[in-house]
């Protein structure tokens, strides 16, 4: 229901514009070993309404909530667009903005965790395994697995995919695709956009290079042209 109510194209085109492109999977499409999943749900409000009728939410008319980082205009607009789409099929969405530290603290406690949390993942390794280990591997005390997802089959496939990356990359590519399809089937995550990280600097600064892994680490040998 929620996945079918998420209008990724509108969000990518009008909210993120040049700072993001529509997601085609659970990891960025330019990531090594990426292969698009078969089961990614398209924006379809009729389908969302159908799922609602079959769900417990539709029977009880309960509200759901979403938290997002309050300093991000893109997260705010995305949340309000989802709220508007869900309202069309009779589902209320409570918007709960906050600082990342506050949202993270609440999400790590099951008693205060929201139904949906809007977040981006900043990888420390240019590999699909970084997303899947960090966000979806079974954890007794969740760190970033804020959906509290636990699936022994996915855990096993993830371990196998990671071990085969160097010697058998095409095997890993297929396994990472299988993991994406499993996560989508289990309604764990709804991908929206692949974010393009931007760097602004004076034209006479040299040595600034893109970091393909953890892009917010700004450690460079900078110089200044005279």
Predicted regions and their residues:
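Append "and occasionally in soluble cytosolic enzymes with long acidic Gly/Pro-rich linkers
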Residues: 1-89, 150, 178
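Conserved catalytic core of Hanks-type protein kinase domains
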Residues: 5, 135, 182
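Bilobed periplasmic-binding protein-like "clamshell/Venus-flytrap" ligand-binding domains
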Residues: 54-70, 114-120, 166-203
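Short, solvent-exposed loop/beta-turn-alpha elements that line the ligand-binding surface or hinge
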Residues: 32-47, 57-60, 108-112, 133-163, ...
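Flexible loop/turn segments at secondary-structure boundaries
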Residues: 22, 34, 72-75, 102-104, ...
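Extended ligand-binding regions for polar small-molecule ligands
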Residues: 1-13, 150-166, 170-173
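Hydrophobic, well-ordered secondary-structure elements that form the walls
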Residues: 2, 66, 86, 107, ...
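Periplasmic binding protein-like
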Residues: 88-137, 175
């Amino acid at each position: 229901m929620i996945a079918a109510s998420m209008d990724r194209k509108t969000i990518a085109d009008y909210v993120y514009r040049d700072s993001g492109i529509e997601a085609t999977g659970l990891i960025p499409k330019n990531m090594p070993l990426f292969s698009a999943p078969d089961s990614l749900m398209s924006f379809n409000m009729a389908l969302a309404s159908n799922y609602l009728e079959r769900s417990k939410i539709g029977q009880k008319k309960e509200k759901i909530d979403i938290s997002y980082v309050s300093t991000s205009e893109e997260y705010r607009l995305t949340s309000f667009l989802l709220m508007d789409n869900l309202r069309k099929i009779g589902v209320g969405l409570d918007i709960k903005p906050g600082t990342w530290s506050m949202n993270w603290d609440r999400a790590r406690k099951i008693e205060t965790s929201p139904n949906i949390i809007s977040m981006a993942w900043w990888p420390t390794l240019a590999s699909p395994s970084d997303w899947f280990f960090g966000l979806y591997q079974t954890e007794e005390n969740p760190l970033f697995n804020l959906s509290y997802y636990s699936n022994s089959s996915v855990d096993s496939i993830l371990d196998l995919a990671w071990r085969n990356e160097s010697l058998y990359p095409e095997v890993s590519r297929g396994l990472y695709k299988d993991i994406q399809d499993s996560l989508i089937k289990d309604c764990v995550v709804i991908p929206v956009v692949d974010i393009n990280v931007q760097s602004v600097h004076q034209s006479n600064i040299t040595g600034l290079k893109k970091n393909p892994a953890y892009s917010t680490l700004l450690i460079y040998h900078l110089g200044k042209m005279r």
